[in-house]
Structures are given as structure tokens and as C-alpha cells.
């Protein structure tokens, strides 16, 4: 749920990368407005309001994220896998469940298979409710593993 401000800063000037962030707005660190697009229009920020549930999240991903990723045709996907958007997480106000994380992971795997021979690196970022984190991470890894 937190904007990836550090990652955005790293890739801000790199036209060979596409940085995408879906995050709660407003929320710490206060970055990630839709108008923040990078020097080469290589940044896509999708700020979502508090209370965003799986239906709204999936609609935003379908409308904004997936078409942009398809157009970019990444040779490698790097996933900052944060699970603090889970409904049980105490630090923010999203209402995603583990099935939502499995859903987005499946879409990212499909894009990686079409454009990057399936190459994905996934890094655990956050999640502060241990039950929500463990269930979400398991759902994510199961999809990555093809289970």
C-alpha cells in the first residue's frame, strides 16, 4: 500500500525501464501522484483511495497496469511483493485478500511468459499482520511456482 518512492527515484531517468506502483493515496510517504510520470514517461503511478477492495483494485489493474505492461513488453519483471494491502493489515486501509494477490501474480506471470520467457524476480517488501502476510505470500508463491 505504500508508494515505491525509492524504486521510482532509481528508475526516474531510465527510459529502458517501466516502474509501476499501485498504492493507497494519501498515505506515507506522500509520493506517487498520477502526475509523477518519469523523465521518459516510464513511471506509472496508480493511487487508490483508502478502503480499496479487490473489485476496485482489479478494475484499476485491468484498466491501467496491464495494458501499460503489455505495451512495454518487459524482458524481465521485478516484483516488489508487499502484502500490507491485505484487509487484516494494521498499517493501512486496503481490503485485499490472498485471492487478489494470486490474481495479480497470475496476470504478471502471463505477461512475463509472453514477453520475457517467464523471467520474474519477486522480493518480499511488507505485510504487518502475520496471518494476512503468510496467506498472501503463500498464494503469491504458489502462482509463481505454477501450483
What do these predicted regions represent?
Residues 1-147:
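A general "terminal functional-core" signal
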Amino acid at each position: 500500500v505504500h508508494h515505491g518512492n525509492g524504486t521510482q527515484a532509481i528508475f526516474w531517468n531510465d527510459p529502458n525501464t517501466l516502474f509501476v506502483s499501485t498504492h493507497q493515496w494519501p498515505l506515507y510517504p506522500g509520493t506517487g501522484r498520477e502526475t509523477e510520470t518519469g523523465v521518459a514517461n516510464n513511471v506509472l503511478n496508480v493511487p487508490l483511495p483508502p478502503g480499496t477492495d479487490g473489485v476496485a483494485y482489479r478494475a484499476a489493474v485491468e484498466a491501467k497496469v496491464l495494458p501499460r505492461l503489455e505495451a512495454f513488453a518487459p524482458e524481465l519483471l521485478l516484483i516488489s511483493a508487499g502484502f500490507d494491502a491485505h484487509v487484516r493489515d494494521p498499517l493501512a486501509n486496503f481490503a485485499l485478500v490472498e485471492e487478489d494477490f494470486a490474481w495479480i501474480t497470475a496476470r504478471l506471470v502471463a505477461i512475463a511468459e509472453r514477453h520475457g520467457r517467464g523471467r520474474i524476480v519477486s522480493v518480499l517488501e511488507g505485510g504487518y499482520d502475520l496471518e494476512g502476510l503468510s496467506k498472501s505470500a503463500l498464494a503469491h508463491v504458489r502462482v509463481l511456482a505454477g501450483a
